[in-house]
Regions:
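Alpha/beta-hydrolase fold nucleophile elbow
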Residues: 159-169
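N-terminal Sec-pathway targeting helices
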Residues: 14-34
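Glycine-centered tight beta-turn/hairpin loop motif at sheet-sheet or coil-to-beta transitions
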Residues: 76-78
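Alpha-helical transmembrane segments
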Residues: 6-10, 14
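An N-terminal hydrophobic leader/cap segment in hydrolases
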Residues: 35-72
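Gly/Ala-rich beta-loop-alpha elbow adjacent to hydrolase catalytic centers
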Residues: 168-172, 176
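Membrane-embedded segments
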Residues: 80-153
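Aromatic pocket-lining residues of Rossmann-like dinucleotide-binding sites
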Residues: 179-180
Length: 181
């Protein structure tokens, strides 16, 4: 009889431990689910801040070595984009449109633009809406519109679309790829 009582005691203890384990596991799963839900809510409401960094500045006082002309490029939704345009020879050289990344301003790209000085190329770099003092807020559709506006501006100057090179850096790569299709 004593052995039976010991086995019953062990059985009840294991059953109680199993119940406690299941309860703790359920609590842990619920906590993890709740934290995951909070993360999703945070990402939803702060996604713009995570994607676009127009005020970040790692400008290192580079001096621009190429002659640029500051231009204003109108968009179809009445935003004027700041651009820097360098023209060597529209007839003999292709024109590169530089779509920059998700952080900083035009000044942050001076070191890259200086590499173009020895190339037989014209170029235009634009600042996205919300960047470099431009009005508006960056959105995916807005960036596509900015890119189309840059192309249209060059076409109005008499540049054939076949003579355009779309160059994207980081975020600008998506825009360049979209517009190249």
């Amino acid at each position: 009889l004593g052995t039976v009582l010991v086995f019953i005691g062990i059985y009840l203890a294991k059953k109680n431990m199993l119940k406690k384990f299941r309860k703790n596991l359920l609590q842990l799963v619920l906590i993890i689910f709740f934290l995951y839900f909070l993360l999703l809510v945070f990402l939803y409401f702060y996604q713009r801040n995570l994607l676009y960094h127009p005020n970040e500045n790692n400008y290192s006082d580079d001096k621009i070595l190429v002659d640029i002309k500051k231009v204003k490029i109108p968009t179809s939704d009445n935003i004027e984009l700041l651009g820097w345009y360098h023209e060597k020879n529209l007839i003999n050289y292709k024109t590169l449109i530089y779509f920059h990344g998700n952080a900083g301003s035009l000044e942050n790209r001076i070191h890259k633009l200086n590499h173009f000085q020895d190339m037989n190329i014209n170029f235009l770099i634009i600042a996205w809406r919300g960047f470099s003092g431009n009005k508006g807020k960056p959105t995916e559709q807005g960036l596509y519109e900015d890119g189309k506006s840059a192309i249209n501006w060059l076409v109005k100057k008499g540049i054939d679309e076949k003579n355009l090179i779309l160059y994207g850096e980081s975020l600008g790569t998506g825009v360049a790829t979209y517009l190249a299709q």
